[in-house]
Amino acid sequence: MKINLLKNAHAAIAALFITMFAMPTTMQAQTSYELEIADTKVTSANCDDLSVINGVSGTVKYDPVAKVLTLQDAIINIEDGHGIYSEVKGLIIKLIGTNKLTAKKAAIGFREALTITGGGTLYAESLSDCAFYAIETDLIIDNCVVNAKSKLYGISGNSSTSEKLIINHATVTAEGTERGSIRDFAAFTLIGCNITQPAGAAFDPAKRCVALNGEMVKSKVVITKDPTAIETPIADNRVAQGIYTLSGVRLSGELKDLPKGIYIVNGKKVVKP
């Protein structure tokens, strides 16, 4: 019996040392990305299944190499904070099925160019801020359905000096009942779609908003896809240049100087023997 106890004690001590040494390694290996879902940081540990975050359900996942956030029949509901906040350069939100974001602050706020695409539908509502908030950057809505609603701002830029809004073959509604439905953009481009509500509304470059009879529109703006329009793909210059690990960490130097392994080189997977 004593021998067995001694063996068990030795095994327990060995397991403790292994755990102590393994924990820092695990912690160091985790990578954080410039992306938050329901005010929770996206990392290499949770990016494959972001439905583990409180207030998130459905399929929500992030590919750090392709910089694609996939929403598939997803619901993101946060009582105090942002639904999605991004500082990822060239982030793509891919919509599959019907998705709903509800947040007290911005439903989607971003400081780097954002493209929303995928063919699905998104309902984005802010209870006390912007449904979409482009902070000194551009927003592209491409071949999908987007509905933005807030009692304050619908789809909004920040300074209105540099932000650009492009809607390409998409159906969009925007409503900001107190401060404007689509506003604070330096430029607004419609490709293969038109403003159909309110009748006669258009982007006013001087006021930098969608206006009607010289006044900013605060009721629902409806942009309808033209079924007869020829599809116009938007050039994609977002492929990450350089060498990255599979977890999305950028590496310095040249491939020839790196150890054996699998890397992402200029957006393509490369195996170094």
Residue ranges and their predicted role:
Residues 2-14, 25:
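Bacterial N-terminal signal peptides that target proteins for export
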Residues 11, 25, 29-31, 199, ...:
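Generic low-complexity segments that are intrinsically disordered, proline-rich and/or Lys/Arg-biased
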Residues 16-28:
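C-terminal segment of classical bacterial N-terminal signal peptides
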Residues 22, 62, 86, 109, ...:
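Generic structural signal for beta-strand residues in well-ordered domains
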Residues 29-226:
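A composition-driven surface/loop motif
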Residues 228-273:
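C-terminal outer-membrane/trafficking sorting elements
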